[in-house]
Curated annotation (Swiss-Prot):
Gene3D superfamilies: P-loop containing nucleotide triphosphate hydrolases. It comes from Oltmannsiellopsis viridis (Marine flagellate). One of its GO terms (molecular function) is ATP hydrolysis activity. Pfam families: ParA (PF10609). It is found in: Plastid, Chloroplast. One of its GO terms (biological process) is cell division. InterPro entries: MinD (IPR010223), MinD_FleN (IPR025501), P-loop_NTPase (IPR027417), ParA/MinD_ATPase (IPR050625), YlxH/NBP35 (IPR033756). This is Putative septum site-determining protein MinD.
Length: 316
């Protein structure tokens, strides 16, 4: 590796990196105070008022595990007793149905609703394992539609009237028109990234676009973390990533080979009888997302003491 990962945020907002000449373009981001220091403490006021939380899950860069995160967070929240709908907004390239094992049940899509060919309840696919979890695909595979921001807003407004507690939008990769339309109806966002400098750069760009679209309640999910590489200074720690982006941390998901098995079987990791380390991390992140206090997992002794803070893992 050509760079060191020992970085500190200086008082003037710049990033100091020891033993390196690597110049980072990132500046710590300042979000609304209520979304940073109170991420785990404040009650879910939206649900108390009867307003569903509309959250877009995005990344900028493809291949970082955004759709996997959407499926597992949505399933975990549903298992906690909330009504959840997952919206696959990746037009023509949907994958969320595969990760949930619902690909054979997609008959109608959101485009059929908007074109007047079916009702909303006909396009919604209810998961048979947890009936308070539903899926709505924007379009069928191989179809390419120009979904405008107005039509996307109309669609989400219709879902908000169905009694759901959480609406999670799986955003397309990239920052083109599809991204803008997908984030338009959202009030909150989860940025999924990996501890790689290219992924972090894209996440920083996405964070700026979210701000420009009026989304200030943003949380960070760091995926594919490898503790052995962090200990050898071959990978940035979660704290490095979080401080570079300046976004409140929702969770950190370790690298897990079971993700491939989970995807092929259409069964989210959080449904395994014996949860893997990444499954535990997804469940903990979901609990923090809904406002329940929880701890970051211990990657060294995960099953002996799951709920202790692993400060070395976070880089403290």
């Amino acid at each position: 590796m050509a760079y060191s990962v020992s970085r500190l945020v200086c008082s003037d907002g710049s990033i100091f990196s020891s033993n390196t000449n690597f110049e980072t373009p990132f500046q710590p981001r300042v979000f609304h105070p209520s979304t940073s220091s109170e991420i785990n403490e404040r009650p879910d006021l939206n649900l108390l008022e009867g307003t569903p939380r509309t959250i877009v899950v995005t990344s900028g860069k493809g291949g970082v595990g955004k759709t996997t995160a959407t499926a597992n967070l949505g399933m975990s929240i549903a298992r906690l007793g909330y009504r959840v709908v997952l919206v696959d907004a990746d037009i023509g390239l949907r994958n969320l149905d595969l990760l949930l094992g619902l690909e054979n049940r997609v008959l109608y899509t959101a485009m059929d609703i908007l074109d007047g060919q079916c009702r909303l309840d006909q396009a919604l696919i209810r998961d048979k394992r947890w009936k308070n979890l539903s899926l709505l695909a924007i379009s069928k595979n191989r179809q390419r539609y120009n979904v405008t921001r107005k039509r996307m807003n109309m669609l989400i407004e219709s879902l908000q009237k169905q009694g759901y507690d959480y609406i999670l939008i799986d955003c397309p990769a990239g920052i083109d028109v599809g991204f803008i339309n997908a984030v338009s109806p959202a009030k909150e966002a989860i940025i999924v990234t990996t501890p790689e400098i290219t992924s972090i750069r894209d996440a920083d760009r996405v964070a700026g676009l979210l701000e420009s679209n009026g989304i200030y309640n943003v949380k960070l999910l760091v995926n594919r973390v490898r503790s052995e590489m962090i200990q050898q200074n071959d990978m940035m720690s979660v704290r490095d990533v979080q401080e570079m982006l300046g976004i409140p941390l929702l969770g950190a998901i370790p690298e897990d080979n079971h993700v491939i098995i989970s995807t092929n079987r259409g069964e989210p990791l959080v449904l395994k009888k014996k949860l893997t380390l990444s499954g535990i991390a997804f469940e903990n992140a979901a609990r923090r997302l809904i406002g329940k206090q929880d701890y970051f997992i211990d990657l060294q002794t995960p099953y002996r003491n799951v709920f202790q803070r692993f400060q070395q893992f976070l880089g403290f």
